[in-house]
Curated annotation (Swiss-Prot):
Record's function text: Forms part of the ribosomal stalk which helps the ribosome interact with GTP-bound translation factors. Is thus essential for accurate translation.
The protein's name in its UniProt record: Large ribosomal subunit protein bL12
Keyword Cytoplasm among record annotations: no
Domain of life according to the entry: Bacteria
GO cellular component terms listed in the entry, alphabetical order: cytosolic large ribosomal subunit
């Protein structure tokens, strides 16, 4: 049996017809008590579920809940953070709750939250 190499087996299989390959697979499954389809299906089902479990939120939105008593200070901070003009920043603050920044990293969201809270605003990160 040492005379037959892996390359010989592969060459033999490469020359088989589809029907012969199908019969060979069935014979191997019966002889060794295995199934060619089950492991593939199990891996395919487990793959997406595992990916969802490991997925962590990477983008955050900073939501201005209220300007509080220091509306002018909050408007100034909103302008500095967003680059909006005075009119747009004032409208954003008056329409609270409203997103100040969207889709930013957690560290950046924390910095923006600290800036706005320092000016007297109530802020949430989602």
């Amino acid at each position: 049996m040492a005379d037959i190499t892996k390359e010989d087996v592969l060459e033999f299989i490469a020359n088989m017809t589809v029907l012969e390959l199908s019969e060979l697979i069935k014979d191997i499954e019966e002889k060794f008590g295995v199934s060619a389809a089950a492991p593939v299906a199990a891996v395919a089902m487990a793959g997406p579920a595992a990916a969802d479990a490991e997925e962590e939120k990477t983008e955050f939105d900073v939501i201005l809940l209220s300007a509080g008593d220091k509306k002018i200070q909050v408007i100034k901070e909103v302008r500095a953070i967003t680059g909006l003009g005075l009119k747009e920043a004032k409208a954003l603050v008056e329409e609270a709750p409203k997103a100040v920044k969207e889709g930013i990293a957690k560290e950046d969201a924390e910095k923006v939250k600290e800036q706005l809270e320092g000016a007297g605003a109530q802020v949430d990160i989602k």
